[in-house]
A protein has these predicted regions:
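Auxiliary Fe-S-binding modules of radical SAM enzymes
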Residues: 101-102, 112-115, 119-251
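Radical SAM/AdoMet-radical enzyme domain recognition
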Residues: 1-110
Length: 251
């Protein structure tokens, strides 16, 4: 909560979103909301206990669900559930979609990135997920209302749903030309593309006494060299291909 409050106090910061597994939200949600948190993304890949243990290697599904329930008490904080379809039988994607059916919560299905541990899963195509959902809930209609965020997610409405269904399909529906994402790792490295090591070391600049203006120039230089797009489908490993896992990168 203290970090959220500090970030919100910075001039120019318009919105702060927290992505989490939700296990501590039952205790911390009130403080996070009071600190000014605008939006919350909670990772939930299955409602099956054994499946959750298999995916996360931690038996904390009940804590995540309690966190989601607690977050729903704060309507001023936009709530989204992120699900990464892995193509394993323990996942019932329709059960996850029920959150958007029963509550004013947006459920987003995020295509597996073939990075680190993710390269061992086949995942599921957006088309297959749409087919599964439409068989149970009816037609998904492209959402054309006010933006629900500033990212690449494509949202759909379903008759009778309180929330929206979204898809972030970076591989099968490549959106690199519209990408507005950069990531700062826990080691202080600014990454401009998930597939490549391209970026700048901000930690080193800070430790060497870099000024705000110098940091701005470093960031501008990194952005000017942002790759035009990923080449995951080509399955060709270049010298600058990222070897870190998503948990190490931050995302």
């Amino acid at each position: 909560p203290g970090l959220i409050r500090q970030i919100k106090a910075i001039p120019g910061i318009e919105k702060v979103t927290l992505t989490t597994n939700g296990i501590l939200l039952k205790k911390q949600m009130k403080e996070l909301a009071e600190a000014g948190l605008d939006s919350l993304n909670i990772s939930l890949d299955t409602l099956d206990r054994e499946g959750s243990l298999k995916i996360t290697r931690r038996d904390l599904l009940d804590d995540t669900l309690a966190g989601i329930k607690e977050a729903m008490k704060y309507p001023n904080v936009q709530l989204k559930i992120n699900c990464v379809p892995l193509g394993i039988e323990e996942q019932n994607l329709c059960e996850i979609a029920e959150f958007a059916h029963q509550y004013p919560v947006h459920v987003r299905f995020i295509e597996m990135m073939p990075i680190g541990y993710g390269s061992f899963f086949t995942g599921m195509s957006q088309e297959k997920i749409v087919s599964l959902l439409e068989e149970k809930f009816g037609i998904l209609i492209p959402y054309e209302g006010l933006p629900l965020g500033n990212g690449p997610c494509k949202y759909y409405t379903v008759d009778g749903f309180q929330g929206k269904i979204g898809f972030i399909s970076a591989i099968s529906h490549k959106f690199c030309s519209e990408c507005n994402r950069i990531r700062l790792t826990s080691q202080g490295y600014l990454k401009t593309c998930l597939q490549y090591t391209a970026g700048r070391d901000l930690r080193e600049a800070l430790r060497n006494g870099g000024t705000d203006e110098e940091l701005k120039e470093i960031i501008k230089a990194a952005l000017s060299e942002k790759p035009d797009g990923h080449h995951f489908r080509e399955k060709v490993k270049a010298d600058d291909t990222e070897s870190l896992c998503m948990s190490q990168i931050g995302g």
